[in-house]
């Protein structure tokens, strides 16, 4: 099947299509993950983006569905050097080609992904259009140029839950005095493994939509407010920002990735768009308090401005060891903390899982 990838700067790359026949538009981003394509494609944080893998062969072990981070593919399309035609794994039920086809998502292979990655690092991420069933480069470039910027898109509404949902903590798992604690989780596109990590520690959860007002959250009588990961520009998550403002100082507040940015904004800091973002499972972060290095899984295109933290009560807890951007903050006096990386991994290393989720349990009075 014919396929073409067009970028807003006029770059045209022709290749071979796989998956569904059709068109995908979005911001072209790259990840350095070697594996974990099931998790990445189903991560709601990739909504509005075309995902490109730098690793040259993707799909080797097929698709099982056991590690999906949501029910569906959220990336708009897939760009790879080569898609494996004959995957093998005893749990595999279909190929990556069939997975994309079933989900109505296009893919393109035969692409020099390293060249595109270097271009993104030098010039920044760009809007792109991926067309399968056609190799009309001019059409692809026009579509890319006319597609909205990520800052203009309303992505959160496309991934948040529609109704509140209660998830009881795992029976007998809460290690603390009294009954299990209850966290209200603002769902901005939460990954399944974040839910799993809170659940397996015995914490009762109420997932609420992104537009939930502070007074509605208060009605659930939470012991903690938790802000999830999600796609797009954090400044658009105004309801979540207002929720943090309302509960900061009254109950513990924690967040991951997008949630980290929202907490920082709510406390008075600023965020900015990175040139090409951090995406992959090999990102080193330094704990400035413990003087330790961890390898983390990351997926974000925005970061918190370190200089803007002055006067907010927040301090930098974690720093990216590569580019020195903020990877986590804590409050000097209040139980407010967040990380930019993904301690729950899926995919990626588990170096920081217990560090982060153990702290969640601790501030709730558990871990005794």
From Swiss-Prot:
Catalyses which reaction(s): hydrogencarbonate + L-glutamine + 2 ATP + H2O = carbamoyl phosphate + L-glutamate + 2 ADP + phosphate + 2 H(+)
Region described as CPSase: spans on this chain: 1-178
Pathway: Amino-acid biosynthesis; L-arginine biosynthesis; carbamoyl phosphate from bicarbonate: step 1/1; Pyrimidine metabolism; UMP biosynthesis via de novo pathway; (S)-dihydroorotate from bicarbonate: step 1/3
Keywords of this entry: Amino-acid biosynthesis, Arginine biosynthesis, ATP-binding, Glutamine amidotransferase, Ligase, Nucleotide-binding, Pyrimidine biosynthesis
GO MF entry, a single one: ATP binding
Residues reported to bind L-glutamine: 45, 230, 232, 258, 261, 299, 301-302
An individual GO BP term: 'de novo' pyrimidine nucleobase biosynthetic process
Chain coiled-coil ranges: none
Active site: 257 (nucleophile), 342, 344
Chain ranges of the Glutamine amidotransferase type-1 domain: 182-368
Pfam family for this entry, one: GATase
UniProt entry tagged with the keyword Nucleotide-binding: yes
Known EC number: 6.3.5.5
Record-linked InterPro entries: Anth_synth/Amidotransfase, CarbamoylP_synth_ssu, CarbamoylP_synth_ssu_N, CarbP_synth_ssu_N_sf, Class_I_gatase-like, CPSase_GATase1, GATASE
HAMAP family in alphabetical order: CPSase_S_chain
Family listed: Belongs to the CarA family.
Role noted for this protein: Small subunit of the glutamine-dependent carbamoyl phosphate synthetase (CPSase). CPSase catalyzes the formation of carbamoyl phosphate from the ammonia moiety of glutamine, carbonate, and phosphate donated by ATP, constituting the first step of 2 biosynthetic pathways, one leading to arginine and/or urea and the other to pyrimidine nucleotides. The small subunit (glutamine amidotransferase) binds and cleaves glutamine to supply the large subunit with the substrate ammonia.
Subunit structure: Composed of two chains; the small (or glutamine) chain promotes the hydrolysis of glutamine to ammonia, which is used by the large (or ammonia) chain to synthesize carbamoyl phosphate. Tetramer of heterodimers (alpha,beta)4.
Name the UniProt record assigns to this protein: Carbamoyl phosphate synthase small chain
Species whose genome carries this gene: Methanosarcina mazei (strain ATCC BAA-159 / DSM 3647 / Goe1 / Go1 / JCM 11833 / OCM 88)
Gene name of the record: carA
């Amino acid at each position: 099947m014919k396929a073409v990838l067009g970028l807003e700067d006029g770059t045209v790359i022709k290749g071979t299509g796989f998956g569904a026949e059709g068109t995908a538009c979005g911001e072209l981003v790259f990840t350095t993950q070697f594996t974990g394509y099931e998790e990445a494609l189903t991560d709601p944080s990739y909504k509005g983006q075309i995902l490109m893998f730098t690793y040259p062969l993707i799909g080797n072990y097929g698709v099982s569905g056991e590690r999906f981070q949501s029910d569906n593919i959220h990336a708009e399309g897939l760009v790879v050097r080569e898609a494996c035609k004959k995957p093998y794994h005893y749990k595999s039920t279909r190929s990556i080609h069939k997975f994309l086809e079933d989900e109505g998502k296009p893919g393109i292979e035969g692409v020099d992904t390293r060249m595109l990655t270097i271009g993104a690092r030098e010039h920044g991420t760009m809007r792109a259009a991926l067309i399968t069933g056609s190799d009309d480069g001019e059409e692809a470039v026009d579509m890319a140029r006319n597609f909205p910027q990520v800052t203009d898109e309303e992505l959160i509404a496309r991934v948040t839950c529609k109704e509140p949902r209660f998830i009881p903590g795992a029976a007998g798992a809460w290690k603390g005095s009294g009954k299990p604690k209850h966290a209200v989780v603002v769902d901005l596109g939460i990954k399944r493994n974040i839910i799993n990590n809170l659940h397996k520690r015995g914490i009762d959860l109420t997932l609420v939509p992104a537009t939930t007002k502070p007074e509605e959250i208060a009605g659930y009588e939470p012991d903690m407010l938790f802000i999830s990961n999600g796609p797009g520009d954090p400044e658009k998550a105004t309801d979540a920002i207002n929720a943090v403002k309302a509960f900061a100082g009254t109950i513990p507040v924690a967040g991951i990735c997008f949630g980290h940015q929202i907490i920082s904004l709510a406390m008075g800091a600023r965020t900015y768009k990175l040139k090409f973002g951090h995406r992959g499972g090999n990102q080193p972060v330094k704990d400035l308090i413990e003087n330790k290095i961890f390898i983390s899984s990351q997926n974000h295109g925005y970061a918190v401005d370190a200089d803007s933290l002055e006067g907010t009560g927040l301090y930098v807890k974690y720093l990216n060891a590569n580019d020195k951007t903020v990877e986590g903050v804590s409050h000097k006096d209040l139980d407010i903390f967040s990380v930019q990386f993904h301690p729950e991994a899926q995919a990626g290393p588990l170096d920081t899982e217990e560090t982060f989720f153990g702290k969640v349990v601790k501030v709730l009075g558990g871990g005794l």
